[in-house]
């Protein structure tokens, strides 16, 4: 048995998320289909993050279990990558132990991109367009209310019937303008739950616009209303999984994929 850790990137706009589904096109489904096309057998995969429909990734980590040893592993991985649709790419790979836990991460970093400038036709799939200029400093100040350990039940898509923990820690949030003058809201933490970052982002914007107060946000964190969630949830296409880090250094092999 051979265990590999892949780093993959994808444009998630046209996909129904990471997790494989019977009647929908997903990233995991396309990856396993590509492996099957090369190996002619089902290959088991597990992603570090279950990105939602429409969400992108620059560094999704995927654990792959092979029941055989390819003679030229780098060539094999590159062939699989070339078999994938053009909006999914394998960036690199590394051998890992059988007991490696792909979801036991040290930190995940997501970034949500907002365009408060002129409409950008060629990047509209990767950003949320707003019609008025925003103050980065004010957005950053509002965002800090969510830093730390809180019960995020009100700011996540968790159903009352689901047994999912909602108390988690966000280590850091920061807001900046990138080189293209777009606004980026960065979220760094170990665990994020369904829709959490999108809901936090839209609540930051709602607070900025005066639709909800900081006092209300604080109350919803300290004592979340039972069985209810916020009505504010940002569009998925502005969100990207930027990076995943583990407790120990995992050095992925990028060179061989490039030079072969």
UniProtKB/Swiss-Prot annotation:
Substrate binds at residue 110. GO terms for biological process: tRNA pseudouridine synthesis. Its EC number is 5.4.99.12. SUPFAM superfamilies: Pseudouridine synthase. Homodimer. It catalyses: uridine(38/39/40) in tRNA = pseudouridine(38/39/40) in tRNA. Formation of pseudouridine at positions 38, 39 and 40 in the anticodon stem and loop of transfer RNAs. PANTHER family: PSEUDOURIDYLATE SYNTHASE, TRNA PSEUDOURIDINE SYNTHASE-LIKE 1. This is tRNA pseudouridine synthase A. HAMAP family: TruA. The gene is truA. It holds the Pfam family PseudoU_synth_1. It comes from the Bacteria. The active site is at residue 52. CDD domains: PseudoU_synth_EcTruA. Belongs to the tRNA pseudouridine synthase TruA family. Keywords: Isomerase, tRNA processing. Coiled coil: none annotated. Gene3D superfamilies: Pseudouridine synthase I, catalytic domain, C-terminal subdomain, Pseudouridine synthase I, catalytic domain, N-terminal subdomain. GO terms for molecular function: RNA binding; tRNA pseudouridine(38-40) synthase activity.
């Amino acid at each position: 048995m051979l265990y590999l850790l892949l780093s993959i990137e994808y444009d998630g706009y046209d996909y129904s998320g990471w997790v494989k589904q019977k009647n929908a096109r997903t990233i995991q489904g396309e990856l396993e289909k590509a492996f099957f096309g090369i190996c002619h057998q089902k290959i088991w995969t597990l992603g570090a993050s279950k990105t939602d429909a429409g969400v992108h990734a620059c560094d999704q980590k995927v654990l792959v279990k092979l029941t055989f040893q390819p003679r030229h592993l780098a060539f094999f991985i590159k062939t699989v990558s070339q078999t994938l649709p053009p909006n999914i790419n394998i960036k690199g790979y590394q051998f890992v132990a059988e007991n490696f836990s792909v979801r036991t991460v040290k930190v995940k970093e997501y970034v949500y991109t907002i365009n408060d400038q002129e409409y950008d036709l060629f990047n509209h799939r990767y950003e949320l367009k707003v019609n008025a200029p925003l103050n980065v400093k004010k957005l950053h100040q509002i965002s800090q209310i969510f830093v730390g350990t809180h019960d995020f039940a009100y700011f996540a898509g968790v159903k009352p019937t689901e047994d999912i923990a909602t108390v988690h820690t966000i280590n850091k949030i920061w807001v900046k303008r990138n080189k293209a003058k777009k606004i980026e809201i960065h979220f760094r933490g170990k665990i994020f739950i369904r829709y959490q970052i999108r809901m936090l982002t839209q609540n930051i914007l709602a607070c900025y616009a005066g639709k909800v107060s900081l006092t209300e946000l604080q109350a919803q964190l300290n004592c979340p209303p039972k069985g209810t969630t916020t009505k504010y949830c940002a569009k998925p296409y502005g969100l990207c999984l930027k990076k995943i880090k583990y407790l120990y250094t995992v050095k992925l092999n990028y060179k061989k994929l490039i030079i072969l």
